[in-house]
C-alpha cells in the first residue's frame, strides 16, 4: 500500500520545469517570507489555501489553518496519517508557475483564503505560500485493530481507535505546537474506507498554460471582524478539501489589505437598527448620524477610519471597539434573519397547502404565508426566489441536489438535511427525492440569458447576490458559518463524478451547517459567501449558484467526497477560524451552467491532476473506512476561467455584468441566509422578495400614491400607511387596492394636506402688520385680526358684519374717534393728536440687534455689569437670574400685544428691540415724550426711578394676562418706582377716561395701579383729574415669588398652590363655586373685597382708573397683587378701593380682580355684594339689589359694600370698557352676557342657546358663535354690547349703538345699569340715579343675582322675615322655591355650566346639566312626553315643548305663581329664547324696568314695568329693594327661582323687555298644535325657601309638612319622592293650564317632578 500510495500520488508530481505540481512553497522561497506573501506580519502566513499535506510549522494560515509546511520545504500531499512520511514529496515541487493547485481545508480560516496572494499592491505568486502538513488519524474498521499494514504510507497511527470512534486530527501550527481536534465520526465505517485512496502528495505543478485557471474560496473568520484578522487562531477542523487552481493575478490586481477587501456582507448601522448590503449605502446613511463635536476627533489626529461607516478615530483602541460594535450588530442581524427563516419546512405534495408556483407544500398556514412571500414580487420567469428556498424547501431548485445534502451537526447518522432548505430527511433516498422534487429546476436555467443581460432580473431577494456565473462554479460550504468556496466548472471530459461521489456517500454533516444556524458562532467571522478575490464585489449579485450549482453537478451525492464528520462541542471555538471550503464541480452536462467552457479552455494540467487524483484514490490500499476518509479529503479539481476582465472586476465595486465577474465576485452573506436581503432597512417582505436591482440603486423609493420619495423603506411604509389610513384601507390589504383607487378616493374626499400658512414675517420690519391701536406686531393678518377682535371686545363691540374684518372696524373706529378724543391708546394724552397712537405712528426698526440701552437711564451699555443683566430696562425690575428677567420680559411682550408664540426668540432682546422701535412709548405711559429718548427726561418725571424704562412700560400689561401673575420679585413694584406721589406719571389717571376703552396695549391693559408699592398718597396715585389720560402703568409685575393668600397671608410658590389654598378657604366659607373667572383665588379676593368695602370706615373710593385698567390690575394682579384681607392701606389696591369709587364697571369696587359678584347661592352669607362686575361693558353694569346682602336694605341703609359707590358716581361717565377682571380676552355671550375664558367655552354656550332656539346647524362660518350673533342681528335685538352710552347719559347710551368709545370725561351718570346679568339683550338699570343700596355690578357670570336685578325679572321674592332680619345677610345661598321667577329667557338656560343649569319651565337651578336633565325628564313625564326627540336631550326636548305649548306653559307657571292669571307677557318674559325676545334693558330712561327704582331708592316710573312689562308699577317705598322685590314677586312673568343666583340676565327681562319678548315670542312661536294634560297641580309654593344649602349640604323642606331633608345633593331624590307622595295623596284633577316659560327653582320643580 505504501508503494502504491506513494507511487500513485507521486506519479502526477513529475511534471518537469514549470509543470511541477504545486505544493506549499518552502518558507525560504517565499519572497519576503510569509509576511511578504500575506502582509501584516503574522496574521496569515499563507494567503489562501490549506493544502491537505503533512504540513509543518509553515502553516499556510500561520496558526489559523494549522497546516504548516516543514522548514525544509517538504510538504508532501499525504494522507493525514502519513504525518511523518514525507518521502514521496520532493521539496522542489512548488509553484513556480503562474498557477498553483492547492488543497483547501473545509474549515480553514476564510480570512486567509479570502486574501489574494498580493499584498500591499505587490503581486505575489501562489507558489510563495508556505506549506505544511496536517496529521490525521485513520478511522479503522471494527476488524482493524492495528495500524494499517501499509508501511509505505508511513502512517503514524498513535492507536487504533475503535470503529466509528472519533478520530483525532493533529495540526501543527506555526510554532510547531500540535493542536489536536477530536472528531466524532458520523457515518458508517464503510464510508471511511474510501479514505484509503488518498495518500498522494499535495504539490503538483501545472503548466503555465494553466494561467486561465484560478480558484477562490469563501472564508469565515469568527474571531476577527470582517476587515481584520486575528493573529493566532485555534486549530483547524478537518473536512473535505478543495484543490484549487489559482491563476496568478495580473500585476494590476493588488490584494488590498484585509480591511479593504474583506468587505462584510452586511453593513449594519450601529446607531440604529438599519443594515445595508452595500457599503456605499451605509456611508450615505451615516450622514444622518452626525457625531457630536466632542466625539469627532481632529482631522489631523484622526488617521484611522472605520472601513464600514467612515467614522474617524484617533485611537486604534476606539476604532477596534467601534468595529466590534459593527461586528456584534452584524451577527445579531444575521441571527435574527435566520430566525425569521425558521418556519416549518416543505411537507411535500401530500400537504394540505400547496404553492401554485412551485412544489412547496405545507400544512402550516404560517409557513405557507412565509413561503408565499418568496413569490410576492418574483419576476414572471422565476418559479422560486431563493437559492435555498428559505427554510421552506421552495428555494433554489437544482436537479438531483443530493450532493448538497448535509447532515446537521450532532444529528443521527441516518438523518440528513437538505442544504437548500434545511429539510431533514430520515434517509438519503428521501432526501434525494426531496431535492429532485423541490430543487429540481433552477430557475436561472430557464432564462439564464435574461439574467446575463439584466442583473436586476435575477432571482432571489438578495438584491445583488445572484448572477449567472458562466465561467464560475461556486464552492460548497460547510461549518456553522459555512464558508462558501467558489465552485468552478470543469470540462466533463476531464472529470469523473463517480470518483468524487460514490453511491454510498454520507451527506456532509458540518457543525451547525448552513441553513439551520448559519453564522451563529464566530463574532468576527468574515461574511459568508465571499469569493476569494478581495474585491468589493462581495455583495454583487453572483452568489446564487452556490448551492444550486453544487447540487446539479453531482446528483449522485456529494457526501462521498465529503466525509461526514462532526466535532466535539467544546472545540467549536477552534473551528470557527478554520478555512472551510467544500468543493463541488459544476460540469456543463449537469445543466448548472451552459456549456460555455470547452475542453480547450481547461488547462491540461488541471485535467491531468484530476486524473492523478482519481488514480491515486483507486490505487490506494486501505480499508473501506479509510477509503471513505481519503475520498472525503482528496482534492476535487474545479476548473474555471479567470480572465483579465475578472481581475478588473475584482477591483471595481460597482455593479458588474455577470460575465465579467467570473470568480472575482464575492458572494454576499445573504446567499447563505436564504437570500435575506442585507442591503437596506427593508421589512420581511423585501427580505424575501426584494428586487436585486433595488439595492444597487441609490435612487429614492417613490410612494405609489403620490410623488413623494423616501430614502428607506421604513419612511415609505409609514407614509403609505398614512395614505391607506386616509382612505380607510388597512396596510395589510394594500395589495388588493390599486394605487389609482387610493388616489381617486383621496381626491374624492379631498384628503389633501393643509397648506401651512407661511408667516410673512419680515425681520427687517419686525412685523409686516401692526395694530393701529396699540402697535403690536403680527406676522400674519390672522393674528392681527384676532388681536383687533380683542380690542373691539374691550370697547364693548362684539357684533359686526360677518364679512367685515375686525381690523377694518378697528381702523374705522379709531379714525372716527380720533376727533372725539378716543381713549388714548398707548397712553396718548387725551389732548394728544388723534393720530399719535404710538405703535402705528412709530418708525419700524429692524429687530436685529439686542435692544440698545440708549433709552435706558444709563448711557452705558445695558449689559455692562451683572446687575444690568438681570434688571428690566423697561420698568427697572430686578431679578436674581436672567431666567426670571426673561419671564418678566415675556409679560411685557404680552402687554405690548406680542403673543408668546411670536416671541419665540429671546424675549429680553425682543422686548428691548420692540421698545427701541417704539422709542419706549412715553405717551402711553403718560411720561414726557423725551422719556423714551433719554433717561434725563425720565428722571424729571420719576424722582427715584432707577430706570426711566421702569415707568415707561410699568408692566402695563400685567393685568391683561388672564389672571396670570407676572412673576417678578416681590420688591419689584417698589423698585425703581420711588417716584413721588405727585409724579406726573401717576397723574395720568384714567379716571377721566373711565368711559374710554383701555387699549389692549401693554399699557392699556395694565391696571392703573402705580408701580410704587403702597404709594404714600392714594390720591397722588389716582389723581381724579378728569382731563388726564388713563394711567397706563400696571401695578408692578406681580411678585414672582410673592404669591400669597390675601386671606391669611401665606406665601406660595405658584398660583397653583395658592389656588388650592384659596379653595380651602372658600369651602370653609361654604362657597363651592368659583364664580369669579372660575378661579378660587379671584373668588376669594372678591369676597374679601366685599368685606373690606362693607367696613363702615372705609373711605369712599375715589374715581378709579379706567375700569379696564383696574380690571386688569385686579384680575391680572392675581396673587401677585398681594391683595390680602388686610387693611386697605396694606393692599396695593386698597387705596383704590377706599378712595376712588370705581367707575361704574370699574373693578376698583372690589378686590383688584374685580371679579363678578358671586352667585347668591354660593356667596358667603356675610359677604357684601360685589360692587363691580368683572367686565364692565355698559350693559354689564348691573344695579344689583342684594337683599340678602343688604341687612339694612329695608331701612334704606346703604349696603356696606355699596358705600364706596355713593358719592363719586355723578362725576363718572359710564365706563364703556369692560373692566378686565374677567378672562383677559373678554369673551362673552352676546345673547346672555355671560363671560368665558376662551372661545371654546363660548362656542359650547352658544350652541346651547341655538339649540334652545331650535337651531341645530351653524350656518354662519360653521361657528355657533357667529350663527348666534347673526340670529341676534336678524332679530333686530339691540345688542348692548355694541352700544356705549354717551358720557352724559348712561341710559341713552345703553339704548343706542354709540361708538364703543366714549369721549373721556367725568362719568356723568352714577352708573350705567348693566342689562340684567350683563347679558346683551337684557335691559339695564335705567335711571341715572341709582340708590346707594344698589350695588352696580357688571354681570360677571352672566348669572342673575337672585337678589335683585334691577330688572324686569322680579327679584327673588324675599320673605318678609328675610328682609326684616338685617343681621341675617341672606346670601340666598339656598334654593328658594318661592323666589320670584327668574324670567330666564329661553337662551338663558342654555349655559351648560353648572351656573346655568336652570330649568326653563320652573326656574330651578341645578348644580350641573345632569341634574337638570333628570329634572327636565320629570317635567316631560308630567306632560306625557316620554321620548327626548330633540337631540336626545330631555333639556332640549323640554325647551321645544315649551316653545310649542305656550298655553300649557303659561298655565303651569300661573299655577306655580299661586293662581295668578296667566298672561302672555308672562310667557314672553319667561321664555324668550332669542335675543330678539329680550328688549334691551334700560336703553330708555324708563327702561329700567328691572328695578324701576330711582337712584334715591324710590321706584322709578318704569319700575312698575320692570317685571311684568309695566303692568304693575313698583311700590314706591324708599327701601326700593324691598319694594322692587315685592313687586317682582307679584309680577306674572316673575318665575319662581329656587335659588338666588348672581344677577342673571333673566332679571333684566322685565318691562319693555318683557313686552318685546312677548311680542317676538308670539311672532316666532307656532300656536300649540294641541293641548296636553298638565301634571296635577300642587298647592301654591310656600313663602319660605324650601331649598337651602351651605357648601355641599342641602336643607330641603317639604311644602306640605314640616319634614326637612338634609344632606348632599343626592338627598334631593328622597325629598322629591316625599313631595310626590303628598301630591298623589292630594289627588288633584289634572287641569291643563297653559304655563309658558317661567323657570321655577329646584324645589318647585321637584314638586312638579312627580310623575
Curated annotation (Swiss-Prot):
Regions of compositional bias (Low complexity) in chain numbering: 386-399, 984-994, 1315-1328, 1481-1493, 1637-1651
Glycyl lysine isopeptide (Lys-Gly) (interchain with G-Cter in SUMO2) crosslink residues: 883, 939, 955, 967, 988, 1000, 1005, 1056, 1108, 1112, 1138-1139, 1177, 1240, 1282, 1343, 1356, 1370, 1372, 1382, 1448, 1464, 1477, 1523, 1534, 1560, 1630
Sequence positions bearing N6,N6-dimethyllysine: 1162
UniProt modified residues of type Phosphoserine: 996, 1006, 1012, 1017, 1025, 1079, 1106, 1122, 1127, 1134, 1146, 1151, 1263, 1309, 1314, 1480, 1517
Chain intervals for the UniProt region annotation (Interaction with CTBP1 and CTBP2 2): 1214-1218
Biased composition annotated in UniProt, kind: Acidic residues: 567-578
Modified residues (N6,N6,N6-trimethyllysine): 1162
Database matches in PROSITE patterns: ZINC_FINGER_C2H2_1, ZINC_FINGER_C2H2_2
Zinc finger (C2H2-type): 267-289, 304-326, 353-375, 416-439, 701-723, 769-791, 870-892, 1043-1065, 1227-1249, 1397-1419, 1596-1622
Cross-link (Glycyl lysine isopeptide (Lys-Gly) (interchain with G-Cter in SUMO1)): 1523
Compositionally biased residues, Basic and acidic residues: 1523-1541
Cellular compartments annotated: Nucleus
Family to which this protein belongs: Belongs to the krueppel C2H2-type zinc-finger protein family.
Subunit structure, interactors included: Interacts with EHMT1, EHMT2, CTBP1 and CTBP2. Part of a complex containing at least CDYL, REST, WIZ, SETB1, EHMT1 and EHMT2.
Free-text note regarding domains: The C2H2-type zinc finger 11 mediates interaction with EHMT1 and EHMT2.
Function: May link EHMT1 and EHMT2 histone methyltransferases to the CTBP corepressor machinery. May be involved in EHMT1-EHMT2 heterodimer formation and stabilization.
Protein name per the record: Protein Wiz
Organism: Homo sapiens (Human)
Gene that specifies this protein: WIZ
